[in-house]
């Protein structure tokens, strides 16, 4: 019996939201000889389909011996789409068939399009594909034919492996199941995502996709997302969701040339009405540094009632709606997001390292093995991009849209198909540096067993020495920092070992843009070193206020510009380097704030009417938290209040009010 054959055939998937990168990679199974006849020779499997009548009667002259007759049928998974209105609820579409995807589109989107005159479709532009949450599938109408086309051998003799039987030997059976999983991943990518994109384009629409899945995602996250027009990650205000999804999206966007990397942002469950911009910001900034540059706030629920507060809500999502008590001031928050999104969409992302995710499927994240030292950035990359988009220029793995990587890290595994390994070998020969170990065999049954000799030959040749053609070869086991040093790749950003500061870097022909984020609640002061040439000079672009100012205190040395940086708790800033800076110079990078006046006069507070607060203004001698009030109408008040007081002060160019 094949170990864990339900998982290997995708008849059962890990029911967890974040399967590890190696969840569908299995160690070689301990095996026994065939003395008891448990292994089925592939030439003993007979196809009886032609002997089956339309009424289900099997007519067959059975040869001598003991035979097992198996009947394999295709049926729906039984999964229905959700959430959906009753009228729009039905079985999930076959995601490995463009024909069925087109039919699904016509029955749903087509009906909407037919009801809206073309002249009135000004706001209907995008078809959204949310995260994959519908379970797997492992078959489609023409599965046998497409299998033969993809791999060059007939899969029918190996079908008993779908219910755990060993055909040929354990290795051959496992390889067949590997081919099956890979074919499913390809089908879901090209027929579902690509098919929906194609039919949308025919109707003047584009697609927007979250390229990861929970509860049965059968695809490969990079290839899957690469077929969509636009790509998105996701993060919640708390918990682990977002820790892999946003890197999934940004890597996909970078290697497939998508300018905008969206994120379903600030989704949440749990305690109601506890989210507000200040406690969302650090998490937003964190995922900005992972490549997100287009924020889609989750969510705004339509509010049909004027007299009901806090209005209609749901168990999921932050309440970005007009019934929220801070909605009237939300422009401060959205302006910060808009400014950040704009700058993070400029130029090209800077990354030194590309981690190859391997070819095994299903897969919705890659492996960062070994860990990348602090101060460097990376992307995940897949086989499709090697085969169709990648070339080497000046020692960099270069993609058509401008992305460049100096070092390719191979996954810690022994298998790779010869066409992929051969392409990597060509790239290294042309000047790329690679880190890893020589693959020894193919994971596929296609071309078996001769294909293993080809993989071993290419791998041995590539990893025989520390140079291959124009490229460099580094064996797994060498400390990665030593590899980067040998290639003269210095950290892109340095700020001290223990600083809680994250960064991302984007480059333009005439500017370098760094986004830096303090992830702690306390103020930090550090000397930032940026890998920027000396013809540039630094500016601070404040995404909260829109202020742009020159930073006069900096030094240029050995490929870096260093300058003192100060960030308040959870503050973020853009450090932009430009040539020929013409901004007005200031004396200090971060002028110190000086207390010029203390307000000791009483405060008159008027609470918003209709929110169950005090009906008349109250007077406090000093400011305090409403939650500490003994007056319940203040303690539990949810709304806005106007504070008024009088005080004397001298005239200054700029004053800040600190009410903490």
Where does each model-flagged region fall?
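Mature N-terminal, pre-catalytic/accessory segment of carbohydrate-active enzymes
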Residues: 1-124
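Membrane-proximal, cysteine-centered motifs at transmembrane boundaries in secretory-pathway
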Residues: 658-660
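Carbohydrate-binding surfaces of carbohydrate-active enzymes
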Residues: 1, 12, 18, 112-126, ...
């Amino acid at each position: 019996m094949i170990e864990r054959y339900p998982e290997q055939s995708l008849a059962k998937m890990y029911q967890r939201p974040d399967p590890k990168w190696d969840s569908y990679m299995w160690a070689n199974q301990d095996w026994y000889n065939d003395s008891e006849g448990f292994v089925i020779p592939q030439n003993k499997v007979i196809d009886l389909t032609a002997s089956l009548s339309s009424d289900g009667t099997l007519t067959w002259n059975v040869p001598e011996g003991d035979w097992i007759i198996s009947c394999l049928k295709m049926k729906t998974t039984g999964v229905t789409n959700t959430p959906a209105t009753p009228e729009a609820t039905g079985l999930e579409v076959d995601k490995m068939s463009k024909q069925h995807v087109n039919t699904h589109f016509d029955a749903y989107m087509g009906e909407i399009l037919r009801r809206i005159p073309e002249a009135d479709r000004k706001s209907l532009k995008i078809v959204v594909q949310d995260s994959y949450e519908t379970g797997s599938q492992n078959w489609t109408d023409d599965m046998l034919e497409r299998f033969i086309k993809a791999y060059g051998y007939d899969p029918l003799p190996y079908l008993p492996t779908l219910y755990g039987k060993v055909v040929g030997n354990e290795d051959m059976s496992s390889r067949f199941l590997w081919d099956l999983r890979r074919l499913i991943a390809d089908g879901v990518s090209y027929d579902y995502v690509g098919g929906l994109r194609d039919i949308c384009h025919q109707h003047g629409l584009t697609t927007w996709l979250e390229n990861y899945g929970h509860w049965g995602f059968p695809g490969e996250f990079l290839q899957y997302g690469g077929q969509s027009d636009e790509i998105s990650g996701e993060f919640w205000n708390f918990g682990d969701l977002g820790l892999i999804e946003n890197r999934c999206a940004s890597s996909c966007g970078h290697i497939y040339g998508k300018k905008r990397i969206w994120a379903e942002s600030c989704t949440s469950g749990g305690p109601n009405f506890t989210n507000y911009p200040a406690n969302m910001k650090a998490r937003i900034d964190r995922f900005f540094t992972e490549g997100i540059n287009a924020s889609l706030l989750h969510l705004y629920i339509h509010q049909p009632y004027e007299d009901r507060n806090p209005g209609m809500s749901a168990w999921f999502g932050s309440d970005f709606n007009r019934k929220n008590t801070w909605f009237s001031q939300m422009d401060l928050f959205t302006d910060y997001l808009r400014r950040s999104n704009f700058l993070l969409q400029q130029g090209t992302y800077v990354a030194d390292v590309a981690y190859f995710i391997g070819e095994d499927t299903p897969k919705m994240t890659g492996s960062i093995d070994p860990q990348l030292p602090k101060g460097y950035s990376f992307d995940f990359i897949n086989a499709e991009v090697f085969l169709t988009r990648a070339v080497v220029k000046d020692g960099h793995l270069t993609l058509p849209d401008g992305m460049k990587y100096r070092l390719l890290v191979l996954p810690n595994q022994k298998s790779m198909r010869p066409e992929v390994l051969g392409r990597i070998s060509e790239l290294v020969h042309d000047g790329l540096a690679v880190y890893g170990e020589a693959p020894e065999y193919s994971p596929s049954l296609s071309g078996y067993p001769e294909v293993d000799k080809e993989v071993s030959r290419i791998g041995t040749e590539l990893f025989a020495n520390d140079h291959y053609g124009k490229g460099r070869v580094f064996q797994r086991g060498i400390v990665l920092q030593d590899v980067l040093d040998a290639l003269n790749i210095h950290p892109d950003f340095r700020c001290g070992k223990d600083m809680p500061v994250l960064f991302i870097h984007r480059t333009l022909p005439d500017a370098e843009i760094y986004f830096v984020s303090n992830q702690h609640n306390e103020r930090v002061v550090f000397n930032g070193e940026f890998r920027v040439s000396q013809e540039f000079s630094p500016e601070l672009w404040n995404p909260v206020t829109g202020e742009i100012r020159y930073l006069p205190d900096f030094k240029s040395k050995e490929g870096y510009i260093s300058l003192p940086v100060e960030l308040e708790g959870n503050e973020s800033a853009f450090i932009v380097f430009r040539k020929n800076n013409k901004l007005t110079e200031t004396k200090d990078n971060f002028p110190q704030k000086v207390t010029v006046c203390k307000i000791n006069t009483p405060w008159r507070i008027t609470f918003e009417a209709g929110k169950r607060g005090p009906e008349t203004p109250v007077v406090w001698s000093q400011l305090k938290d409403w939650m500490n009030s003994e007056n319940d109408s203040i303690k539990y008040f949810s709304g806005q209040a106007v504070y008024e007081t009088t005080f004397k002060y001298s005239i200054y160019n700029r004053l800040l009010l600190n009410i903490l």
